[in-house]
């Protein structure tokens, strides 16, 4: 009899000895392969000029990030749409009018992060969740499991999109010259748009919504409109922006924005353990993110729960509001006054980085894992072990990468209290536990090495920090608006 593949996450976990090891074996094991697959070559090339030139553009001229392909979108409609989405998010939805957006931060009943996304209020009873598929999956499941009068409709990311058409195109236009370009295309001054608010704007002959938001920490707008206008709007931006030094941002540079802006985009979603998420595991199928994700990095624990983060661990503590009931509230209230890890940036020691790179040209039998620029992650969910000088684990790091703007190799990290002050020296362990053996042949044999690192603020960039200060955003995460 042929063996039937597990149909749900619950069935999968019943058949594998360790879900951690299973996720380590999931391929591909190279971040740039993952990201280029998420953004198809027809619309978003890996590079339009060079990834270094494109990174520089969001600090010096204009960068256009094409977000039309890689994110999941999920409509939530019905008379209970506001109450339902509020029941899933740790932050309050007070003053959430039509045309506004909110951060949707979802937790498990045990208080660990599922993921976060952007929630747009398109109409009185029509909300749109856009972002990480782990988050849209959680929303979709709960719409069916909970007793709210809502319906959902999915607009899948391109790789899962059989129609090969989206409801909306989506471009992030940002940089010091972005406003001049947008006003030119609008035919005059733009309306005043507060952070996470939107307004109708003109793009030549086309109408679109412009939302105040940023990927790289510079002033700009996220603009979106009907898919039928996608190619025309893209061409218009490119032609009108040429004199301003506009650069289209390819898939390689796009995913380095989180290192500068300080967004922990893809946590290990806390759905693999806990009685409160058993229903999700029984619902979750092979098309959903929890079964497709890959895990990598130097941190290893057989207990997948050791990878979980709370909102406090990624500097979301200030947006948690206990003025409403939400999944995970009791658990978060119980730990509210306890010490928490803090999200920071780690700046890698340049000499140690060069030592790893130079090993590629040596004759040693087992070399360190090469550091791929600009993104060195070995999985969609990459977690490195961070230690003190005595070798004690003090936290986890993600998104190892380089930006030409900072001229440094960096990671985002969540560290124990006592190690989060800027200037603190720590050690990052580089290379997978087991030297690649856990990755099922998808990663070459290598040896682990220690890389010195220095703690810096998150976000790292002065541009990102000053931008948040100017518009009332607390450093490292979104302030409630």
Residue ranges and their predicted role:
Residues 1-41, 46, 123-481:
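Conserved, structured C-terminal
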Residues 53-60, 106-116, 202-211, 394-396:
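Short amphipathic beta-strand starts and helix->beta connectors
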Residues 85-87, 115-118, 130-131, 139-142:
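Short, conserved acidic/polar surface loops in the N-terminal third of protein domains
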Residues 95-97, 106-112, 117-123, 141-142, ...:
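Short, charge-rich binding segments
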Residues 79-81, 91-92, 106-114, 125-127, ...:
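A short acidic, glycine/proline-enriched capping/turn motif at secondary-structure boundaries
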Residues 1-103, 112, 343:
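Acidic, proline/glycine-enriched N-terminal capping motif
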Residues 66, 109-111, 376-379:
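A short catalytic or substrate-binding loop motif that flags glycine-/basic-rich loops and adjacent residues
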Residues 63, 72, 104, 117-118, ...:
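Residue-level detector of beta-strand structural context in well-folded domains
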């Amino acid at each position: 009899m042929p063996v039937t593949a597990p149909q749900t996450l619950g069935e999968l976990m019943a058949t594998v000895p360790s879900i951690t090891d299973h996720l380590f074996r999931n391929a591909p094991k190279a971040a740039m392969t993952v990201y280029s697959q998420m953004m198809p070559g027809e619309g978003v090339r890996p590079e339009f000029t060079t990834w270094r030139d494109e990174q520089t553009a969001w600090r010096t001229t204009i960068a256009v990030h094409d977000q039309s392909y890689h994110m999941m979108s999920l409509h939530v409609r019905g008379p209970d749409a506001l109450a339902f989405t509020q029941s899933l998010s740790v932050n309050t939805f007070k003053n959430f009018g039509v045309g506004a957006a909110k951060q949707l931060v979802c937790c498990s009943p045990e208080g660990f992060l599922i993921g976060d996304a952007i929630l747009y209020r398109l109409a009185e009873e029509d909300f749109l969740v856009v972002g990480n598929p782990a988050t849209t999956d959680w929303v979709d499941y709960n719409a069916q499991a909970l007793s709210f009068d809502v319906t959902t409709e999915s607009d899948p990311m391109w790789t899962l999109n059989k129609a090969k058409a989206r409801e909306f195109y989506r471009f992030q236009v940002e940089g010091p010259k972005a406003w001049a370009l947008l006003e030119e295309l609008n035919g005059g001054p733009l309306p005043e748009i507060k952070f996470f608010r939107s307004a109708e704007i003109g793009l030549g002959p086309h109408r679109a919504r412009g939302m105040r938001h940023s990927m790289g920490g510079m002033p700009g707008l996220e603009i979106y409109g009907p898919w039928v206008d996608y190619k025309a709007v893209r061409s218009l931006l490119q032609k009108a922006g040429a004199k301003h030094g506009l650069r289209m941002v390819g898939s390689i540079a796009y995913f380095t924005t989180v290192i500068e802006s300080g967004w922990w985009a893809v946590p290990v979603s806390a759905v693999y353990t806990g009685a409160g998420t058993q229903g999700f595991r029984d619902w979750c199928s092979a098309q959903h993110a929890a079964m497709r994700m890959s895990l990598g990095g130097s941190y290893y624990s057989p207990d997948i729960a050791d990878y979980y983060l709370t909102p406090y661990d990624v500097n979301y503590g200030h947006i948690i509001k206990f003025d409403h009931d939400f999944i995970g509230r009791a658990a978060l209230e119980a730990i509210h006054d306890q010490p928490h890890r803090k999200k920071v940036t780690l700046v890698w020691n340049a000499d140690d980085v060069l030592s790893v790179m130079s090993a590629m040209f040596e004759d040693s039998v087992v070399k360190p894992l090469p550091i791929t620029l600009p993104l060195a992650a070995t999985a969609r969910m990459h977690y490195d072990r961070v230690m003190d000088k005595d070798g004690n684990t003090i936290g986890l790091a993600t998104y190892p990468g380089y930006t030409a703007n900072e001229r440094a190799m960096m990671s985002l990290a969540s560290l124990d209290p006592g190690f989060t002050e800027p200037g603190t020296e720590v050690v990052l362990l580089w290379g997978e536990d087991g030297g690649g053996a856990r990755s099922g042949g998808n990663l070459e044999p290598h040896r682990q090495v220690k890389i010195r690192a220095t703690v810096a603020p998150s976000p790292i960039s002065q541009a990102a920090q000053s931008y948040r200060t100017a518009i009332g955003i607390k450093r490292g995460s979104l302030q409630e608006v």
